[in-house]
Amino acid sequence: FTTKSSLRYLLIVLDLDGTLTNSKKEITPKTKAALMKIQEEGKIVVLASGRPTPGILHLADELELQKYGGYILSYNGAKIINCKTKEIVYNKTLPQESIQVLYDKAKEFGIGILSYSESEIILGNGQDQYNELEAKINRLPVKEVENFPEYIDFPVNKCLMTGEPEKILKAQEKLRELFGEKLNI
């Protein structure tokens, strides 16, 4: 048994959407003040999200994570960055050969596919309401490319498929069968 006053936390990990941020995707003044206070006390703040790293940077800047040595855990944990040193602490990327397969399957199921560079969202097969929302939430411009697999010639941490829920669920089931444990679907 322990009392509240005897607990010693050294690190706080926060999900972004609906936890750290409100419905407007903003950090409230009260939350910001509390997080600044704990950082001043030497605690470390980690921002954790499925968002891409560039989509989290503005929140990290607002909380001054670079000053206090906080971290960004992005792409559902596939990349971890020390904000103070800019060191990439962990980086798991998709196998390059999986990009073509994912693109082909997205086309087969009639759903969108996107990935991320350091500065933009890259669309593989057209705009839809879901990838428009992804761009808005992450505050990133969108670049639509003709040949998605060919364009993605650099390491990526995540591809996201977008579309109507029924189609996504069907694709998810088939992709899990296809990739097994090789990819997190």
Identify the residue ranges that each predicted region occupies.
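Non-catalytic pre-domain segments flanking phosphatase-related domains
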Residues: F1-L14, E40
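Solvent-exposed alpha-helices and their adjacent loops that cap or buttress functional pockets
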Residues: T2-K4, E64-L65, Y151-D153
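Asp-based phosphoryl-transfer active-site loop
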Residues: R8-K25, L47, L102
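Short beta->alpha junction loops/turns
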Residues: K24, P95, E164-P165
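Short alpha-helical
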Residues: E26, P54-G55, E166-K167
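Active-site phosphate-binding/coordination module
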Residues: P29-Y130
